[in-house]
Structure formats: C-alpha cells, structure tokens
Amino acid sequence: DSIYILDEPENSLSAENQLKLKRFIEDSTRFYNCQFIISTHSPFLLKLMDAKIYDLDDTPVVTKKWTELSNVLVYYNFFKQYEEEFDKK
C-alpha cells in the first residue's frame, strides 16, 4: 500500500527496457497494491493497464486515452508513413 512518484523513468532506457519497466509497474500494482504517479512521454508507459492519464498540455487539464495524446500520434504517424518498409521483412 505505497505510492511511488516517478519523473520520466524512461530516460536512458531502451524501448525493450521501457517494456520491462511497464511490466514491473503493472505487476507491482497488482501484487503489492501500490500506486504510481508517473510523468512520462513514453508511449510504452502511457499504455499502462488501467492508467488514468492527465494531459497537462491542455488547458484545463483533461484525462485522455493514450491513443489521443499528441506525442503518441507523432510516433504513430511516423511509423505509419514507413509501414511498407516493415512489411518487406
């Protein structure tokens, strides 16, 4: 029954390690009943199970789904633009 505050924990972590951190946080909330308050730009961490996301770029601050956040849409549009290159593999 603890609360942890993390400020951009994805800094210096590879995408693979961000996914490991995501799993660790989800397991911690499930098995140890703790809560996390996280400031992040990582689409991996924004996809945390049952996360309540506050978009601090909006005035007033609103809650959004992770797929509605502008930085996630930038990633999506970037990879969508090069989708054919992934299909060639």
Label every PLM stretch briefly:
Residues 16-37, 42-89:
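C-terminal lobe/lid and adjacent interdomain/linker elements of RecA-like ASCE P-loop ATPase modules
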Residues 3-5:
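Walker B motif beta-strand of ABC-family P-loop ATPases
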Residues 11-14:
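ABC ATPase nucleotide-binding domain "signature" loop
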Residues 7-9:
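Walker B catalytic acidic pair
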